[in-house]
Amino acid sequence: MDIRKEYLEFFRSKGHEVISSMPLVPDDPTLMFTNAGMVQFKDIFTGAVPTPKNKRATSCQLCVRAGGKHNDLENVGYTARHHTLFEMLGNFSFGDYFKEDAIAYAWEFVTVNLALPIDKLWVTVHNNDDEAFDIWSKYINPSRIMRFGDKDNFWSMGDTGACGPCSEIFYDQGEENFNGEEDYMGGDGDRFLEIWNLVFMQYERTADGKLNPLPKPSIDTGMGLERVIAIKEGVFNNFDSSNFKPIIKKIEEISSKNATSENIGSYRVIADHLRACSFMLSQGILFGNEGRPYVLRRILRRAVRHGYLIGFRKPFMAKLLDTLIEIMGGHYTELVENKNFIEEQLTLEEDRFFKTIDLGMSLFNEELEKTKDIFSGVTAFKLYDTYGFPLDLTEDMLRDRGLKVDLAKFDELMNNQKAMAKAAWKGSGDTSNEGDFKQLLEKFGSNEFVGYNNTTYKSKIIALLDEHFKEVKILEKDSTGWVMLDKTPFYATSGGQNGDIGALEDNKHIAIVEETTKFHGLNLSKVKVVNSSLKQGESVDAIVVNRNEVAKHHSATHLLQSALKIVLGDTVSQAGSLNDASRLRFDFTYPKAMTKEQIDEVEDLVNSMIARGISGNVEELPIEQAKKKGAIAMFGEKYGDVVRVVSFEDVSVEFCGGTHVRNTADIGSFYIVKESGVSAGVRRIEAVCGTAAIKYTKDIISKMNEIQAEVKNSDVILGIKKLKEQIKDLKKEIETSQSKTSSPIEETIINDTKVIVSVVENGDLKKIVDDTKNANEKVAIFLLQAKDDKVLIVAGSKNTNIKAGDWIKNIAPIVGGGGGGRPDFAQAGGKDTSKIQEAKTKALDYAKENL
């Protein structure tokens, strides 16, 4: 049985509209990831957006709980049902049906469609929810209905807002299978497994804690697909179901090791984390050092560490992707469409971690031998900072041994170094003004953007806000604040395009528009009042400046993406962008630096597209029709049922809400200024076009003229080559001079080994040591030099019993220093030049004792 399909079709038959899973990156600044089915309907439940015509919806939502408030990462592999990524089935009513129908639908699906035995089912309701109790009593013996308090059976979005009692359906997995102390209804054991939660949103909680009945109660339900599949297949652990078992078998195959009771946890971790990493990558989340990218990195590295435990020493995750696609690719086509990209990114990140994991594990095991109760916070930090071990990975390794990290010391080091993981999520968002924006939205509604065809517009000021987003009636001269126009020509920052700037004018006053941003559906422009004042209710001329230049760069970005796909291949995808009047920046997925030839080819391709004078076309299409047309969507972006599509004939077709030129010829010319790396697997191109390109070429010509004058040669390249030759010759002279020391290097023979211990006044110590080792088959050399009130020490050893690193460690403290290195080469520094001769003597004594 395809339970996912069965569920969606069941609720479709009950008048529900089937809604696709929303992106894992939610359009909600308070959430790290989409973590429940109701997230995409939150604005409907709160009244922030109008209720749709069809007040019934159903979905199968991909969810991630591995960061922020909801984090199951540390439990994965140790329990039967925790996952970093899971699917949540849900049905929703927006002021339509309520408890009677919600319970009836749930009971029908569970007992008829799933055919679960009634004598295995239990139900919970809130202590005070007699209505739900009475309804359930029609379907199940009241002795199987349990009442619980707020902790278990009351749900709310937050301290205020929509909330209500909930009712949960449990499945009894059998006393014969689970008979521990916690295996009772309401206990923490695994015998009674919650499979479905029905939330009855019937109240609004106010700031004083009062519960006011909602005029139109709603329904929000959630059922974990993985749990239901396990129940239907008669297994007691989600990882033993058909959702995971094929992946675990594939791990056994490629590792040539069968899972055992001792190591099965590692196989389960890898299977789970493969799913999370693959879906996150497919939706444009890339590996990085902060925010969501860092969570992705933590998940992947945890999987690699468990792979290491079962014998993997090189990248292996990509080899599992085909198996995952066989299981989930039929419903989630993004896995198939982005298969090559996912494999590429997994392999790159795994390879990076495998290069340091041996060293990190050695350090970990070394510290572990010294640990009794608390693992060193200093070592945990070094594992993180030097070897790329996330803290929770170290904690995970200690968990099996019953040990903990000295978190106080770890945090102290992190704070001192301002480590990037200290505040892992930059996008946490400031929600302190959310109530103010909601009030504005309720008061005025969303204001209309009219700027696609207008750069000037007669608008009315419907709201003014001060710098802290508090509503005011007037903004005085020289003050800064925010303006909400009834109809605005100013484009708000989104989709990689910077918000418009410009001015608000009339006969009396002028305000400079410094930026335009969207807050909770409101287009607001930040203004600086430079003359007179701005008052609510007044009409002004809204004037956009530099729009044409911004449009040129945005359209050029679309052409650039097409050119990159032609030159580098279709696996290239957008990872971010920025467009303003002076430049464009385009981030894209590619595993290595572009060659000069590739950069030139891309630049030439874009300029040829510009020269063709291709007409632009903008249309709004149903999303499925747009996809069939080949429109490229930005990974991670949230789209509605109808999307805006910008196309330049067959050259470029993209989902886009930004502003563009009418014809590619309007762009003028295009120059790539820089190609660089952003992170592993992500490259960045910076480019200019239009007026900015003219300025760029003028600057280049000006600099060339300056260089020409400096090198005193009409052929600049030839002049630079001559200068480089002169510099090379001068460097040789300096090196020769430095290698000639003012004091002779002292040599001696100890047990057939040449030993050099000397104080050198001038010269490059490292070069002298290297040259000496190259010139001798068997030699030990120890050089000291006083320079700028400091002591430099360099030691080398070739085919002798002396280890240079140990030699340095023993002598450097004499001059107040420290250092170390390899057995064949080491160096150190010291502060006390007065002890240099003593150090020399001790160094020679050390050689005599060890040879």
UniProtKB/Swiss-Prot annotation:
Keyword set, alphabetical order: Aminoacyl-tRNA synthetase, ATP-binding, Cytoplasm, Ligase, Metal-binding, Nucleotide-binding, Protein biosynthesis, RNA-binding, tRNA-binding, Zinc
Q: Name its cellular compartments.
A: Cytoplasm
Give the co-factor note. Answer: Binds 1 zinc ion per subunit.
Annotated S-S bridges: none
A GO cellular component annotation in the UniProt record: cytosol
Q: Which molecular function GO terms apply here? A: alanine-tRNA ligase activity; aminoacyl-tRNA deacylase activity; ATP binding; tRNA binding; zinc ion binding
Q: Where does Zn(2+) bind?
A: 554, 558, 656, 660
Q: Which cofactor does it need?
A: Zn(2+)
Which PROSITE patterns does the UniProt record give?
AA_TRNA_LIGASE_II_ALA
Q: Does the keyword Transferase apply?
A: no
Pfam (any one) = tRNA-synt_2c
Query: EC no.?
Result: 6.1.1.7
Function of the protein: Catalyzes the attachment of alanine to tRNA(Ala) in a two-step reaction: alanine is first activated by ATP to form Ala-AMP and then transferred to the acceptor end of tRNA(Ala). Also edits incorrectly charged Ser-tRNA(Ala) and Gly-tRNA(Ala) via its editing domain.
Cite the domain annotation text.
Consists of three domains; the N-terminal catalytic domain, the editing domain and the C-terminal C-Ala domain. The editing domain removes incorrectly charged amino acids, while the C-Ala domain, along with tRNA(Ala), serves as a bridge to cooperatively bring together the editing and aminoacylation centers thus stimulating deacylation of misacylated tRNAs.
Name the family the entry cites: Belongs to the class-II aminoacyl-tRNA synthetase family.
Q: What is this protein called?
A: Alanine--tRNA ligase
Species annotation: Aliarcobacter butzleri (strain RM4018)
